[in-house]
């Protein structure tokens, strides 16, 4: 950026030098008058035209240089602000991800993506039986929150949000029994893995909505093209979390500090703030298989989850959060 400023100043100084010699033009006119008396009008006219065209070319170059310098300044500002035109990385297969080193994956966004399948069948092609589900991965691609509409007298609707969390919201390494019945229906029960992730999104009006994206204790059943189940949504904050006034569920003050005595700390409007609620809630998810590969035991699909947001330990009414994305799993 400093080099761009220096180049701009240099060109501006050059432009001043070029425009300064007004006396040179008067001298040229006097020379033209003398030449006219000796019959040299044509040559002087050529000289004048040549000088004017050269001057126009030079000023044009100066103008272009100033534009280039301004563009360099704007480009430098974009670089400093961290602007990037790069999109999401190409989705890789499980084997391709495993073949990469840490430095090849670092900073690319691949670690936040679920693998895909190369080839395979467009349908669920696994035979009936009991399988061990491993390496299950749930990657959100869309977060919408049900909130009051911008239009007056309009009912609440799901609104698009802006993700405020870094690329750490994908659930991975989830395991559990997976059963395929003789009629083609499936059942999956989640037992272990990285099954929750704290996420914060921002509504168009600026309100931020934190929630715990999870599939904890999921029990989903149905046909491969749509099997649904409920799961547990733990409290966003634990019982030992203290609010700004030192109140907590299992520790801290019972009432807000500096409130007058006489039972005011237990008034109805303050109960939700004073009495912390860490009870879990329930969410629901629907999964669909889009491709399977029995040779490698891999299966992928899409999902749509509906769950409540954070309640600030019972002090706020939760919002409905709809999460859509893709999932991947291995059956052994």
Swiss-Prot record:
GO molecular function: mRNA binding; oxygen evolving activity; poly(U) RNA binding
Entry comment describing in which tissues the protein is expressed: Leaves.
SUPFAM superfamilies, A to Z: OMPA-like
GO annotation, cellular component aspect: apoplast; chloroplast; chloroplast stroma; chloroplast thylakoid; chloroplast thylakoid lumen; chloroplast thylakoid membrane; photosystem II oxygen evolving complex; plastid
Record keywords, A-Z: Chloroplast, Manganese, Membrane, Photosynthesis, Photosystem II, Plastid, Thylakoid, Transit peptide
Range of the transit peptide: 1-58, 59-85
Disulfide partners: none
Subunit structure: Interacts with CV in the chloroplast thylakoid membrane and in CV-containing vesicles (CCVs).
Protein name stated in the entry: Oxygen-evolving enhancer protein 1-1, chloroplastic
């Amino acid at each position: 950026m400093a080099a761009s400023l220096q180049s701009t100043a240099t060109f501006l100084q050059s432009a001043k030098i070029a425009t300064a010699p007004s006396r040179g033009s008067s001298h040229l006119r006097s020379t033209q008058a003398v030449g006219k008396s000796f019959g040299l009008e044509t040559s002087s006219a050529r000289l004048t035209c040549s000088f004017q065209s050269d001057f126009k070319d030079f000023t044009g170059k100066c103008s272009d240089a100033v534009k280039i310098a301004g563009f360099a300044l704007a480009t430098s500002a974009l670089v400093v602000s961290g602007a990037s035109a790069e999109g999401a990385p190409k989705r890789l297969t499980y084997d391709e991800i495993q073949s990469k080193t840490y430095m090849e994956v670092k900073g690319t966004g691949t670690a936040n993506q679920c693998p895909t399948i190369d080839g395979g069948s467009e349908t669920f092609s696994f035979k009936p039986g009991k399988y061990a589900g491993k390496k299950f991965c749930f990657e959100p691609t869309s977060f919408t929150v049900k909130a009051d509409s911008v239009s007056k007298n309009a009912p609440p609707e799901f609104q698009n949000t802006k993700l405020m969390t870094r690329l750490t919201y994908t659930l991975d390494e989830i395991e559990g029994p997976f059963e395929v019945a003789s009629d083609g229906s499936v059942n999956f029960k989640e037992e272990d893995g990285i099954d929750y992730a704290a996420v914060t999104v921002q509504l168009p009006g600026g309100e931020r909505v934190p929630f715990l994206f999870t599939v904890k204790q999921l029990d989903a059943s149905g046909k491969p093209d749509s099997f649904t189940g409920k799961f547990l949504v733990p409290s966003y904050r634990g019982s030992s979390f203290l609010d700004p006034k030192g109140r907590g569920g299992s520790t801290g003050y019972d009432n807000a500090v500096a409130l007058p005595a006489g039972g005011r700390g237990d008034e109805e409007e303050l109960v939700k703030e004073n009495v912390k609620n860490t009870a879990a809630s329930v969410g629901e998810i629907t999964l669909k298989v889009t491709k399977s590969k029995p040779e490698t035991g891999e299966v992928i699909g899409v999902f749509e989850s509906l769950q409540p947001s954070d309640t600030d330990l019972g002090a706020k009414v939760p919002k409905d959060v709809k999460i859509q994305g893709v999932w991947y799993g291995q059956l052994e």
